[in-house]
Design a protein with these regions (language model features):
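Active-site glycine-rich loop that binds ribose-phosphate moieties when present
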Residues: 1-11, 46-66
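Glycine-rich anion-binding loops of enzyme active sites
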Residues: 1-43
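Glycine-/charge-enriched secondary-structure boundary and capping motifs
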Residues: 3-9, 68-166
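Residue-level recognition of alpha-helix initiation/capping sites
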Residues: 14, 56-57, 81, 159
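Short, hydrophobic/aliphatic alpha-helical segments
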Residues: 18, 57-71, 137-138
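Residues on a specific face of well-ordered alpha-helices
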Residues: 18-21, 27, 31, 49, ...
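A structural signal for small-residue-enriched, beta-sheet-centric alpha/beta enzyme cores
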Residues: 29-30, 59, 74-79
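Active-site phosphate/oxyanion-binding loops
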Residues: 38-50, 132-136
Length: 166
């Protein structure tokens, strides 16, 4: 958690997404998977560099753009993984459709995931999310994996999303 002051007009909650919003993910996923491979002594140097680059990329520019383009809701992808933080953005009127093939992954992540290098936290997150999403498939574990210095999930209307992405 963070304690600090924010200007009331720049505060963006994580649970105020609107029907019809587009959600943008600002950084690739997979730091949790790659760090598990590192702990197991299996991470290739090229993938280590990719992991470190991802962790060292700050969210400052993305957060400033989010304020500029009238974001409805925003969350950082950290310990609850992508799906856990998306769940925080839901309310009874909102559901989210995920286009799995369009989710960015750091280099090497899928290979390490496929051989079972999955952080324990991913299983805990999966069980928690499954309580409210009973049809969740186990192949979504990758998207339950905790992230360190993950990107932002920015929810905003389609017009502002297109402008932000330019």
């Amino acid at each position: 958690s963070v304690t600090g002051k924010v200007h009331p007009k720049q505060f963006i909650a994580n649970n105020t997404a609107q029907i019809g919003d587009v959600i943008i993910l600002t950084k690739p996923l997979g730091i949790g998977i790659l760090s598990t491979a590192l702990k197991g002594g299996l991470l290739k140097n090229s993938h280590l560099n990719s992991m470190l680059e991802g962790m060292l990329t700050l969210n400052l520019k993305a957060s400033r753009l989010a304020v500029k383009f009238k974001t409805s809701a925003m969350s950082d992808v950290t310990g609850f993984g992508l799906l856990g933080h998306l769940k925080e953005m839901l309310n009874p009127q909102i559901s989210i459709r995920i286009f799995e093939n369009s989710l960015p992954l750091l280099r090497g992540v899928r290979g390490y995931f496929d051989i079972g290098l999955i952080p324990a936290g991913a299983y805990q997150n999966y069980e928690f999310i499954k309580k409210s999403c009973p049809h969740l498939q186990e192949n979504t574990l990758l998207f339950c994996s905790p992230e360190t210095s993950g990107g932002l999930l920015i929810a905003l209307d389609e017009k502002n999303a297109n402008a932000l992405l330019k």
